[in-house]
Swiss-Prot record:
The gene is cbbL. InterPro entries: RuBisCO, RuBisCO_lsu_C, RuBisCO_lsu_C_sf, RuBisCO_lsu_fd_N, RuBisCO_lsu_N_sf, RuBisCO_lsuI. Disulfide bonds: none annotated. RuBisCO catalyzes two reactions: the carboxylation of D-ribulose 1,5-bisphosphate, the primary event in carbon dioxide fixation, as well as the oxidative fragmentation of the pentose substrate in the photorespiration process. Both reactions occur simultaneously and in competition at the same active site. The basic functional RuBisCO is composed of a large chain homodimer in a 'head-to-tail' conformation. In form I RuBisCO this homodimer is arranged in a barrel-like tetramer with the small subunits forming a tetrameric 'cap' on each end of the 'barrel'. The record marks 326 as: Transition state stabilizer. This is Ribulose bisphosphate carboxylase large chain. Heterohexadecamer of 8 large chains and 8 small chains. It comes from the Bacteria.
Amino acid sequence: MSKKYDAGVKEYRDTYWTPEYVPLDTDLLACFKCTGQEGVPREEVAAAVAAESSTGTWSTVWSELLTDLEFYKGRCYRIEDVPGDKESFYAFIAYPLDLFEEGSITNVLTSLVGNVFGFKALRHLRLEDIRFPMAFIKTCGGPPNGIVVERDRLNKYGRPLLGCTIKPKLGLSGKNYGRVVYECLRGGLDLTKDDENINSQPFQRWRERFEFVAEAVKLAQQETGEVKGHYLNCTATTPEEMYERAEFAKELDMPIIMHDYITGGFTANTGLANWCRKNGMLLHIHRAMHAVIDRHPKHGIHFRVLAKCLRLSGGDQLHTGTVVGKLEGDRQTTLGYIDNLRESFVPEDRTRGNFFDQDWGSMPGVFAVASGGIHVWHMPALLAIFGDDSCLQFGGGTHGHPWGSAAGAAANRVALEACVKARNAGREIEKESRDILMEAAKHSPELAIALETWKEIKFEFDTVDKLDVQ
């Protein structure tokens, strides 16, 4: 063995920098934005990322002789400049598929965004995008139902779904919570939602909430003749408790449940998605904690990666920001990951932040959810940006109506239907937004009051995380 094995430390680029490599269709491809320490060559930084996220360690080890390192190692095959940023660069790395457990997003992320992010040779590291090969996609369950099945279940066609989060999000008793749900649904909303941080607190235990919400949903359905629903948050302390809540929602004949997929974790999320698929339940996904991970432009994980991972792990709806509301997200970037939630094939398009072609095959799509600081004046822009296969959720923009939640719901429903009608008639709804809404308000006092209430409310702040394009 001593004749074959050279102990010691060698540069990462000697093994993991392979610019001559042509990625295979079965490779998982990743794009990292790297910012190395001063004096460390780009090739060494990029190769270190490839090594530490695949087979490498800081020293040569004798046990490399027991496997085929050339087959299993990650390979950095390309380096690119980041437009407008002289200290950072893009490293493109190819990973052989056998490095990952089939269908396990947890395992993929453990490798790609694990210890390598604490590597001292790096000042910053950000996972910008992943190309999942079809051979991996076919091992994932994906959305439990998908867009088409969800529309059939809810009997909603030709427009976005309309919803809201119940406010105040914390502090209501179960009975009062149910009353607010009822007011919103009878006013014209399709769906209402638990806030992401309501689980089972002393002021309102989960079982009490589920029962009062179910009563409210059924009463609103009887009065309106429409299918209604409420996202019952099943996120819990343990997986066992999560499944107990999901089972009870099914017993109550509720159509949809909810999970906080980042705080709850991908293992729990995939398990819950599999349960929903077997039990005919829709699954709404909230992204609480995402901004801790994705907002810094040089370090962390871009949300487009988290969105792709969610589509594979499983969910029928996912929050994506609003572009026009109170939360971070520019238009082109948001459209980029909406494409990856809904389309069967998404081409490389740097203007939308997509670094790779992504073929999703026959995997069902996910509804994009716009929620956060939106009101009736935003309706034309939201419809133009998100299209029909989306869910528009107005929390404060429903409950803040001077006449109450039912009137706020009615105002949003009238505004949405007016915008859809105008779009279908060929009008440019963003340019003509004021005229469209004011015309509709002539026949809806609820909308007229809403337009007056929120006419001065805007969230005009510069985007922190911008696309790296010139």
